[in-house]
Amino acid sequence: MSWQHFKQTWLIKFWAPAPAVIAAGILSTYYFGITGTFWAVTGEFTRWGGQILQLFGVHAEQWGYYKLIHLEGTPLTRIDGMMILGMFGGCFAAALWANNVKLRMPRSRIRIVQAVAGGIIAGFGARLAMGCNLAAFFTGIPQFSLHAWFFALATAIGSWFGARFTLLPIFRIPVKMQKVSAASPLTQKPDQARRRFRLGMLVFIGMIGWALLTAMHQPKLGLAMLFGVGFGLLIERAQICFTSAFRDLWISGRAHMAKAIIFGMAVSAIGIFSYVQLGVAPKIMWAGPNAVIGGLLFGFGIVLAGGCETGWMYRAVEGQVHYWWVGLGNVIGSTILAYYWDDFAPALATSWDKVNLLNTFGPLGGLLVTYLLLFTALMLIIGWEKRFFRRAGLTPAKESV
């Protein structure tokens, strides 16, 4: 394989979602085994909100939620912080390789309102449920935590309401029509593309170098950044967004991303099971109303905002300003939840059991139940897709894998 062929195929063209999501599932499994924690982002965003408040004299470290998730240190001294920095770096490098970085402003003020409001709702819901589309879903279900199943189902329902809500006339922005005599060809500036590709390589090499230097003295932090770079490359090149997985189901009937997510969790689950059998403790959260309410809010919020936690991250570094607002909303929403946590927690979360399916059904039973539930979810998705297209008189498009 020549360099130019490799460059075009793997560094410039978008990747098929299914193998990329499966790769993310495998990578998240090794991340858990090596660092002892799961791939998650909103917990760290919540810490960012708390530390911003500290700069203004607010003693956020005294709040119950920050005692729970630990506000100590900085992003440079926390595993989650270094992993997220690696994700941003990986996303940015991948976007530069493909010359996919351009400052794009929101087309109307209503889009900014959507971004901030949706981000706040999603951030609040995610932290109420102790995780977003990662910790309470994609990496939560393979941890065999019952709360992740509650969250996943509630997120699907919330996203349905979000999809219906965003179709209201208030969110329809006017489209300016311009008369033309011929189609404009899509063009790229070769010199700009080459410069950005080189810059992307510098960013990539810089992130890898930073991670390796850190690993020499603090192995887990350095490895967390390396994993983050890998996660960032995957989500940007394959455009992995859980919002589109849910929204596309309800609006267009497309289920390709949703099925890919199921496959990714199925691959991850057996790996997590192996680590748990070797003695690594799984991350189990409260299976209470917090998971259901949080999932409903999160599902609604991500569709309103137009992006989930992974989706807004890669789109933000591509220059889509709309998603800067979504990210800001996420931090605000999660920080608001942290402020009110002590009021909500006893009734909605901490008085409920943390249910580990491996303990409830036994190791093999818990694994079997998880795969049965994943298979059921896959069948429901396939059934919905067929029903949607049958009612529309269409045939589902075959997508590359």
Swiss-Prot record:
Main location: membrane
Source domain of life: Bacteria
Annotated GO CC locations: plasma membrane
Transmembrane segments: 14-34, 79-99, 119-141, 146-168, 199-219, 222-242, 260-280, 284-304, 321-341, 364-384
Keywords per UniProt: Cell inner membrane, Cell membrane, Membrane, Transmembrane, Transmembrane helix, Transport
InterPro entries to which the protein is assigned, alphabetical: Sulf_transp_TsuA/YedE (IPR007272), YedE-like (IPR047732)
Stretches assigned to coiled coil: none
Pfam families recorded: Sulf_transp (PF04143)
UniProt keyword Lipoprotein present: no
Topology feature Periplasmic, residues: 35-78, 142-145, 220-221, 281-283, 342-363
Protein localization: Cell inner membrane
Residue ranges, Cytoplasmic side: 1-13, 100-118, 169-198, 243-259, 305-320, 385-401
Topology class, membrane: Multi-pass membrane protein
Family from the record: Belongs to the TsuA/YedE (TC 9.B.102) family.
PANTHER family: INNER MEMBRANE PROTEIN YEDE, SULPHUR TRANSPORT DOMAIN-CONTAINING PROTEIN
Protein's UniProt name: Probable transporter YedE
Organism whose genome encodes this protein: Salmonella typhimurium (strain LT2 / SGSC1412 / ATCC 700720)
Taxonomy of the source species: Bacteria, Pseudomonadati, Pseudomonadota, Gammaproteobacteria, Enterobacterales
Gene behind this protein: yedE
